[in-house]
Amino acid sequence: MANSWDQLGEIASVAQLTGIDALKLIGMIVNAANTARMHKKNCRQFAHHLKLIRNLLEQIKNSEMNQRSEILEPLQGLDDALRRSYILVKSCQEKSYLYLLAMGWNIVNQFEKAQNEIDLFLKIVPLINMADNARIRERLEAIERDQREYTLDEEDRKVQDVILKQESTREAATSVLKKTLSRSYPNMGFCEALKTEEEKLQLELQRSRARYDADQCEVIQRLIDVTQTAATVEPNLEKVLTKKEELTSSKKRDDLYDTDSSSIRADSRSTSYVSSGHELLSGRSLQHRGNWHADLLDCCSEPCLCLKTLFFPCGTLAKISTVATSRQISSTEVCKNLIVYSLILSCCCYTCCIRKKLRKTLNITGGCIDDFLSHLMCCCCALVQELREVEIHRASYGTEKSNKEMSPPTPQFMEE
C-alpha cells in the first residue's frame, strides 16, 4: 500500500495552489480542518500547530529577515509542504467516508510526516535559529514544544473492524453503515448515500490502478462490495418487516376465530400471551411463543462443532454473545470475561446470562433456572444448542415460523 503521503492529492491539484503564500495556505488549511468529515481531531490538531507557525511567519514578515535571499529560498520549500498539507486536510472532507475509514492508520501517518516535514523546513533556515529577536525565538521554541500525537478514534476503529473483516455478516455491516453514513451525509437517505460512496470509491479505484497499487485496489474493491451488498440488504429488510406485520395481523384474526370455536384453545393461548416469558409454560404453549429448535442433548449430531466448542469454547460463546447482545464481541473479550468469572467460581452464571439474553433476542420461552441447570449439567452441550439455534433462525426464521403459525382454521358445515 502506498506510503507516500503526497499521493493522497493529485499533482494537478497541488499545481493549482501555486502562487499562494504560506500565510494564506495556513488559513485555508485551518478552514478545511473545521469542516472535515473524517479525522476531525487530527485535522484540528494539525491546524493548531500551523497557527503557531503562522505567528512565526508573521513575525518574520514584519522584520528585516524577510528581505534576505538565504531565508526566502528555504521558505519556498515550506510553501510546497503546506500545499500538500492542504490537499491532505481537504481529502478528509471530500473523499469517500469508507475510503478514509479503511485508510485510517495510513492517513494518521501522513499527518505525522506532514508536521515533521514542515518543522524541518523551519529548522534548516539558519537566520531563524540565530535570530536575536526574542519574540521570534520564543515562537520557534513554542513550535518545537508542540509535538502533536495523531491517532484513529476508538469509534472509527470499531467501525473499521466491522467493515473490513471478512467474517462480518451483511446485516452487521449494514447496521453500522446506517449509523455512520447518516452522520456523514445528514441530508441524504441511506440508499443515496451508498450510491455517492460507491461513485467516490470507483474514482479512488481508478487512481490506485493508475499507480499499480494492488493492495490498495483490493481494499477499495472490498469497500465497493460492502456498499453494493448493503444496497441489496436494505430493501430486503423492509420487505421482511412488512411481511412480519402482515403475519402478525393475520395471526390475530386466526386467534379470534379460534377463541369462538374452542374455549380450551382460548384458555391455552391466553395463558401463553399473558405469561410473556415470566414463567415456565407447557409444551403446547411453547409452540405458540417459540421453542428451542435444537435439542440440548443432540450435540453429537454435529461432532465437528461439538469438538470445536469443547476445545475452544470462547469462539462459540463469542458468536452467541454477538447475536444475544446485538454488538460485535470478540473471542478475546469472552475469554477475559470467563477468566474473571472463573476467579470467583461463577463461570456458569456468566454463560447462563448469555443464554437468557439469547432467548429474549430469539423470542424463546424459558426461565433462569432452566438456563442455569442447562449450563451446570453440560456447558458444552448448552453452547452447541445455542449456536445451532442461531444458525436455524438465520436460515429459516421467516419461512418456517410463518408456515407453522399460518395454519387454516378447521372447516365447519351448517346442519340442514
Curated annotation (Swiss-Prot):
The chain crosses the membrane at residues 338-354. InterPro entries: Adaptor_Cbl_N_dom_sf (IPR036537), MCAfunc (IPR045766), PLAC_motif_containing (IPR006461). Disulfide bonds: none annotated. It is found in: Cell membrane. Expressed in roots, leaves, stems, flowers and siliques. In the root, high levels of expression in vascular tissues, in the stele and endodermis, but no expression in the cortex, epidermis, root cap, promeristem and adjacent elongation zone of the primary root. Not expressed in root hairs. Detected in shoot apical meristem, leaf mesophyll cells and vascular tissues, upper half of inflorescence, but not in petioles of rosette leaves. It comes from the Eukaryota. This is Protein MID1-COMPLEMENTING ACTIVITY 2. Inhibited by GdCl(3), but not by verapamil. It comes from Arabidopsis thaliana. GO terms for biological process: cell surface receptor signaling pathway; post-embryonic root development. Disruption phenotype: No visible phenotype when grown under normal conditions, due to redundancy with MCA1. The roots are able to normally sense the hardness of the growth medium. Mca1 and mca2 double mutant shows a strong growth defect. Signal peptide: none annotated. GO terms for cellular component: plasma membrane. It is a single-pass membrane protein. GO terms for molecular function: calcium channel activity. NCBIfam families: A_thal_Cys_rich. The gene is MCA2. Keywords: Cell membrane, Coiled coil, Membrane, Transmembrane, Transmembrane helix. Calcium-permeable stretch-activated channel component. Probably involved in mechanosensing and in mechano-stimulated calcium uptake mechanism. Residues 191-219 form a coiled coil.
